[in-house]
Design a protein with these regions (language model features):
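Conserved catalytic-core segment of nucleotide-activated headgroup transferases in glycan assembly
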Residues: 14-18, 130-269, 276
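Acidic carboxylate-rich catalytic motifs and surrounding loops in phosphoryl-/glycosyl-chemistry enzymes
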Residues: 34-40, 88-91, 197-209, 294
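Structural motif corresponding to alpha-helix initiation and N-cap regions
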Residues: 37, 71, 95-96, 207-210, ...
């Protein structure tokens, strides 16, 4: 039996793109068994899978203080596995930490959205026998197109002409990191002057997640964008730390003033750009894309699949013509959908079939057996968004007060030990889920869970599968 373990880092706040990525292995890998393991949940012991996959949300913990502890948790599982595969993203942040991890874990394959200047990011790994290959930041599948298409309004009936949400990254990552946001803001200002209705923001308070983002995009005729990424490497996060300290001490500094205070004279530079999953999201929603002229994919052409913007700042008058011509914009939308969505080229199924071929994961036509190492812990949460934070808070308070064993004894005796007045609101839930709460306590006491498992709102892959099935 070909057994693949997928180590992920899904949380309650995970973006849909992250969820789709983690679930794609269970849906599309076509091996005999897939076990999903949250890095903050139970780590299987005494198993020897054929392959282990580390998703990019797991590797994103490299910027957290608990990274080394998480590595120690999963290293025995990795070392028991012959085929070791990693899928990093945003490689330019804390890349030295990744490079050291890939080398020490004897990673076999690394799939990254960045396909140039890899020796700058990974000097140790590229000098060894680790194989690097390209992976996009996101792909499409049937669930993606069916789920998001329901929010797409007819093009002529959409209320907003131009819409976008984009992060304005700090200057320590170079000019490339700010390019997408700056282009969006500048073009929105020009479009507004031309009489178009615009809602473009780089503010964190305006972030739209999940269905709210797709409802917004599905009611927008045009969106503006560019490749994401960076042009400066922050090997161990020291530049990011300096930015945080400067912001704390000087909260009124502009981005330009902040950049002037950073010493970027001896930093490592390169082209660390990648195509954003927004291209697929916009196509799925039937939104016409206005993009910085660039090479996105072979055959993806300006004026045919997207409306181009030139980097010099001047806007071709034909851009305004397209924005005023619903029929012409519709032709570009349909062409982009045909290119991005209606072939197998950018599907998870095709990509993961290629990954399996390159890494030696044996494929089968049989139905994949899907399991989750922490599924029984997630049962107590159910469909309520309030239960998990309360449960984690309750158990954390019990640990800090040194009464966890007493809480356990009371639960086993059929009683609920309330630690503060707000706990009374959950009495009924505790009454019906006593045995499941005891599993959390046992998990912590046995070492299957760590204190961060009671702080970070992590979720199992199976819980997201259940919620998608229920829609």
């Amino acid at each position: 039996m070909t057994h693949v373990v997928v180590i992920h880092g899904l949380r309650t706040s995970s973006r849909q793109t992250n969820v789709d990525n983690v679930l794609s292995f269970s849906r599309n890998l076509r091996c005999q068994k897939v076990t999903n393991v949250n890095v903050l949940g139970r780590i299987p012991r005494h198993v020897s899978p054929d392959a282990v996959i580390l998703t990019y949300d797991t590797l994103a913990f490299r910027t957290w203080p608990i990274w080394n502890q998480l590595v120690n948790r999963i290293m025995p599982l990795i070392e028991s596995t012959p085929v070791r595969i990693a899928f990093p993203q945003d490689d330019y942040t804390n890349c030295q930490i990744l490079d050291e991890f890939f080398s020490s874990a004897k990673m076999k394959h690394v799939y990254s959205p960045i396909n140039s200047d890899l020796e700058v990011l990974y000097p140790q790994s590229t000098s060894r026998s680790i194989r690097f290959a390209e992976a996009l930041t996101g792909y499409v599948d049937d669930n993606f197109t069916k789920r998001e298409a329901k929010f797409s309004r007819p093009f002529a009936l959409r209320k907003l002409d131009l819409g976008q949400r984009v992060r304005l990254l700090d200057p320590h990552l170079g000019s490339r990191a700010a390019q997408k946001a700056e282009i969006a803001v500048q073009f929105a200002a020009a479009a507004k002057d031309m009489g178009f209705s615009c809602d473009v923001s780089t503010s964190p308070k305006d972030v739209l997640l999940g269905e709210n983002w797709f409802q917004f995009l599905g009611n927008t005729r045009f969106t503006v964008g560019a490749k994401g990424g960076a042009s400066i490497v922050d090997p161990r996060g020291k530049l990011a730390d300096k930015v945080r300290r400067l912001r704390a001490r000087h909260p009124h500094l502009s981005r330009r003033e902040l950049g002037d205070r950073l010493n970027l004279s001896d930093v490592m530079c390169g082209d660390f750009s990648a195509v954003s999953p927004r291209l697929f999201e916009a196509a799925a929603m039937g939104t016409c894309q206005i993009l910085l002229r660039d090479h996105y994919f072979d055959g993806f052409e300006p004026w045919r699949h997207y409306v181009p913007l030139d980097s010099g700042g001047a806007i071709d008058p034909r851009v305004w013509k397209v924005m005023r011509d619903i029929d012409l914009a519709g032709e570009i939308v349909r062409a982009s959908q045909a290119f991005l969505l209606e072939t197998e080229r950018f599907t998870y199924a095709k990509f993961l079939a290629q990954v399996a071929l390159e890494t030696g994961i044996e494929q089968t036509n049989e139905k994949t057996i899907i399991s989750d190492s922490s599924a029984d812990l997630d049962v107590v949460v159910g469909n309520s968004s309030l239960i998990l934070p309360w449960l984690q808070s309750y158990l954390s308070r019990a640990i800090l007060r040194g009464v966890l064993k007493r809480v356990e004894r009371e639960l086993k005796a059929g009683r609920f030990m309330k630690l503060n007045d707000s706990d009374s609101d959950y009495s009924d839930h505790v009454e019906t889920n006593r045995d499941k709460i005891l599993k959390w306590i046992d998990g912590f006491q046995s070492g299957d869970l760590i204190i961060e498992s009671l702080v970070v709102p992590w979720r199992t892959a199976s819980s997201f599968m259940s919620s998608l099935t229920a829609r």
